């Protein structure tokens, strides 16, 4: 039921955004980042398809596609039958932009070291570290959790990747009933 509620909420947000590609891009970013945290590939795919329908900017589309791909890898989900991730990545204009480098990295055209060396500033360097760690985590390597925790505590706190790293490394608290009856 929660999954269906999340999908309905995303659909409503996209309906409210209409054809405004900037607003739809923001909705897609939020939905795809939530999908990664919830390990829900279908939620991410829904966000990606809508972002593509409104022709979201490359800077939004690349992140949504990356997060959907990582979600698929983390859950061992097969790519969608329409291969939306590949279509989105191939639609990104190639050149020297950071979005282009991220798309190339996701397609395997750049390795982690090449992505890191192409990062020009603190946000890009943080993102390069995040994606290298996430690729390992998606493959089952939990030894990268300290690296993600470092990213979460780093100086690029405004990045969605920093928030994702924080959420992924936060201790999980099990809440239960109190040991004795409450008054």
Q: Where do the PLM segments sit?
A:
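A cross-kingdom marker for long, charged
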Residues: 127, 149-183
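Short solvent-exposed coil/turn linkers within tandem alpha-helical repeat scaffolds
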Residues: 16-22, 53-61, 152-162
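Alpha-helical repeat scaffolds
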Residues: 3-15, 41-53, 78-92, 110-120, ...
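Residues that mark the junctions of alpha-helical repeat units in TPR/alpha-solenoid scaffolds
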Residues: 24, 61-63, 118, 125, ...
């Amino acid at each position: 039921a929660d999954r269906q509620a999340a999908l309905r909420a995303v659909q409503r947000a996209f309906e409210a955004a209409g054809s405004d590609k900037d607003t739809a891009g923001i909705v897609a970013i939020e939905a795809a980042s939530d999908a990664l945290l919830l390990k829900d590939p279908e939620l991410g795919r829904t966000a990606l398809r809508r972002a593509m329908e409104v022709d979201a900017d490359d800077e939004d589309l690349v992140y949504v596609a990356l997060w959907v791909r990582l979600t698929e890898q983390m859950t061992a989900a097969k790519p969608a039958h329409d291969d939306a991730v590949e279509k989105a990545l191939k639609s990104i204009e190639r050149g020297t932009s950071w979005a282009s480098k991220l798309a190339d990295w996701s397609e395997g055209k750049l390795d982690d070291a090449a992505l890191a060396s192409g990062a020009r500033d603190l946000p890009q360097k943080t993102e390069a570290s995040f994606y290298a760690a996430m690729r390992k985590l998606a493959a089952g390597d939990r030894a990268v959790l300290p690296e993600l925790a470092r990213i979460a505590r780093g100086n690029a706190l405004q990045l969605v990747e920093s928030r994702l790293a924080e959420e992924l490394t936060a201790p999980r608290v099990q809440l239960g009933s109190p040991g004795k009856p409450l008054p």
